[in-house]
């Protein structure tokens, strides 16, 4: 029996708690057609990816994952291809962290590691992946945020017992990533379009969400903003992959325009729109943790999800 896989990184907008609702809206053919190519253009922390890898009822012919964050994708590759080298670097960093007995010492070490990470001084991909994971697990509230120059700028988080080197998880994730035919891409989401296999592609699209208000979200995961113009480009991408015969599901916020109408129901007119309800646990203001409605858009009907949506609204 293979070990249990879980996301190796904390990532805002992670889908772990939403998966039961999302799976209720899956197209039925992913359970019956082993020739399907599964694509995630915005893989992020990989909650959906790892869940599907472990689902014994789903068998994909091929998997394509992509993210614009090069360091995140370097982590995926390091975990898949060289987990023991990565663990060696993580153990070294973990030893240094716990050697510091005061919070001031741990804080100084954090900023020294952050400076090394931002300077590009790492001597290997595994060292850079290890620093990425260390910063993610010891920074404030598990955020990933960069400034306009692309430098990671989240402060030290003062966590009591951060798990810096989760050897069991990294080895489990590596085993699962090596159990399938998987291609890992870095860059703009649109490049996955060339991997669409007509009639045999399911794509889960989880882009940066449109903020519910001008002050409702922290700044970017990369130094490339994902504004309304980008949301419109993404809709055009969905039109293209639909025309190529791909099946897709897209998540986003239930953002409203100035008149109070749903931004995404208007933008994706002609597609199927549902609601799901998300507990949000990573936020710059950690005390704000509540269930928020989100939009789920598909290019196929799903009565089970529509019934679920209606019951939530009543």
Residue ranges, per PLM feature:
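S-adenosyl-L-methionine
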Residues: 1-37, 42, 47-48, 55, ...
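Short loop/edge segments at beta-strand edges and connector loops
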Residues: 185-188, 277
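Short amphipathic alpha-helix with an adjacent loop that forms part of the alpha/beta core around
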Residues: 27-30, 193-199
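Conserved proline-anchored active-site loop of SAM-dependent methyltransferases
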Residues: 38-52, 65-69, 133-140, 147, ...
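Class I S-adenosyl-L-methionine
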Residues: 267-309
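Mobile active-site "lid"/loop adjacent to the S-adenosyl-L-methionine
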Residues: 146-160, 209-230
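Class I S-adenosyl-L-methionine-dependent methyltransferase module
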Residues: 55-179, 183
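Conserved Class I SAM-dependent methyltransferase catalytic core
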Residues: 231-279
């Amino acid at each position: 029996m293979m070990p249990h896989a879980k996301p190796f990184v904390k990532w805002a907008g992670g889908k772990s708690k939403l998966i039961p609702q999302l799976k209720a809206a899956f197209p039925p053919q992913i359970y019956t057609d082993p020739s399907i190519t599964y694509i995630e253009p915005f893989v992020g922390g990989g909650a959906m990816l790892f869940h599907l890898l472990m689902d014994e009822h789903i068998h994909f012919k091929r998997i394509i994952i992509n993210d614009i964050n090069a360091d995140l994708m370097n982590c995926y590759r390091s975990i898949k291809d060289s987990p023991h080298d990565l663990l060696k670097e993580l153990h070294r960093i973990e030893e240094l962290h716990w050697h510091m007995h005061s919070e001031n010492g741990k804080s100084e070490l954090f900023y020294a590691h952050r400076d090394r990470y931002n300077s590009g001084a790492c001597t290997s991909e595994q060292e850079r992946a290890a620093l990425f994971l260390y910063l993610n697990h010891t920074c404030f509230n598990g955020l990933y945020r960069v400034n306009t120059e692309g430098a990671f700028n989240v402060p030290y988080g003062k966590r009591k017992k951060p798990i810096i080197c989760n050897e069991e998880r990294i080895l489990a994730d590596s085993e699962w990533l090596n159990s399938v035919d998987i291609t890992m891409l870095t860059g703009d989401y649109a490049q996955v379009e060339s991997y669409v296999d007509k009639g045999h592609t399911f794509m889960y699209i989880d882009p940066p969400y449109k903020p519910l208000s001008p002050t409702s979200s922290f700044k970017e995961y990369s130094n490339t903003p994902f504004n309304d113009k980008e949301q419109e480009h993404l809709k055009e991408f969905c039109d293209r992959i639909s025309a190529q015969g791909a099946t897709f599901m897209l998540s986003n916020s239930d953002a409203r325009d100035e008149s109070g109408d749903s931004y995404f129901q208007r933008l994706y007119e002609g597609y199927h729109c549902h609601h799901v309800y998300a507990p949000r646990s990573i936020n710059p203001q950690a005390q704000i943790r509540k269930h928020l409605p989100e939009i789920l858009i598909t290019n196929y009907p799903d009565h089970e999800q529509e019934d679920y949506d209606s019951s939530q609204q009543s």
